[in-house]
């Protein structure tokens, strides 16, 4: 896919899925703006991504803070020229059984995952509406569709993202802004690599394809939804879960 000249904003892009998405876009010719909560990690990611030869900027922000989101989008427009694609990837977990989960654990996850998606979208939409063109891809999760014990806060946030995606698609279609979501299943990361073999084997028993997704699998799904190949797709939740939930 060719994204030459396109400007893409990706939240939570210093590592894991977010970094893989950013890497895929720069390799496809896009200019990229990334953000994270650790300034050193943001700077390191910017340096790595810049090797592809496109423009890359990075900022340390809190996606749950409206002014941070507004400033980040303003900086992106100033330095890159516009915003064509927004990928809402930033997310955290604070797992606990419901009866033990604190309000702080609940609020922290909802604020970053759900409120952050809302605030960043709202900031980017001002740019997209003005040019009557844009594309938003939200990262949800398979657990937002099927639930998961010990993750009431995370599941609620990811289910909320699915509902928000469908609502956004209905609201913004007349402005030529498409909104879709990707719902990953188990994804291979440094964290999953460190799990005991018996734990990984038990997890894979539930996956018909018998492997974890690679971060690049998620990146490819995001790029498809952001591309012209998906120009008549909006309000869709693309499952990338190896058949874990059908």
List each language-model region with its residue ranges.
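The beta1-alpha1 cofactor-binding region of Rossmann-like NAD(H)/NADP(H)-dependent oxidoreductases
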Residues: 39, 60-72, 103, 216-217
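Residue(s) in the substrate-gating loop at a strand-loop-helix junction
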Residues: 141
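Alpha-helical segment proximal to the catalytic Tyr-Lys
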Residues: 126, 170-174, 231
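C-terminal helical subdomain
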Residues: 181, 204-229, 233, 240-242
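Active-site helix of classical SDR
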Residues: 121, 157, 165
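Conserved glycine-rich cofactor-binding loop
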Residues: 7, 14-16, 38
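Substrate-binding pocket helix/loop in short-chain dehydrogenase/reductase
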Residues: 97-98, 102-110, 192, 203
């Amino acid at each position: 896919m060719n994204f030459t000249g396109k400007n893409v904003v990706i939240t939570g892009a210093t590592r894991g899925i977010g970094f893989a998405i950013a890497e895929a876009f720069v390799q496809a010719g896009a200019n990229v703006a990334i953000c994270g909560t650790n300034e050193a990690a943001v700077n390191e990611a910017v340096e790595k991504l810049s090797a592809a030869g496109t423009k890359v900027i990075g900022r340390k922000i809190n996606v749950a803070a409206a002014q941070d989101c507004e400033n980040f989008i303003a900086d992106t427009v100033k330095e890159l020229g516009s915003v064509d694609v927004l990928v809402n990837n930033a997310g955290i977990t604070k797992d606990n059984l419901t009866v033990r989960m604190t309000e702080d654990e609940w609020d922290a996850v909802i604020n970053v995952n759900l409120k952050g998606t809302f605030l960043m979208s709202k900031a980017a939409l001002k740019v997209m509406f003005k040019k009557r063109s844009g594309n938003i891809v939200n990262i949800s999760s398979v657990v937002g569709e099927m639930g998961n014990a010990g993750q009431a806060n995370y599941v609620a946030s990811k289910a909320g993202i699915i509902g928000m995606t469908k609502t956004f698609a209905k609201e913004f279609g007349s402005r030529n802004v498409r909104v879709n979501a990707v719902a990953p299943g188990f994804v291979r990361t440094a964290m999953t690599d460190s799990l005991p073999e018996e734990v990984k084997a038990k997890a894979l028993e539930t996956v018909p394809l018998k492997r974890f997704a690679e971060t690049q699998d998620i990146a490819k799904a995001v790029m498809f939804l952001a591309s012209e190949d998906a120009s008549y797709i909006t309000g869709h939740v693309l499952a990338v879960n190896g058949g874990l939930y059908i």
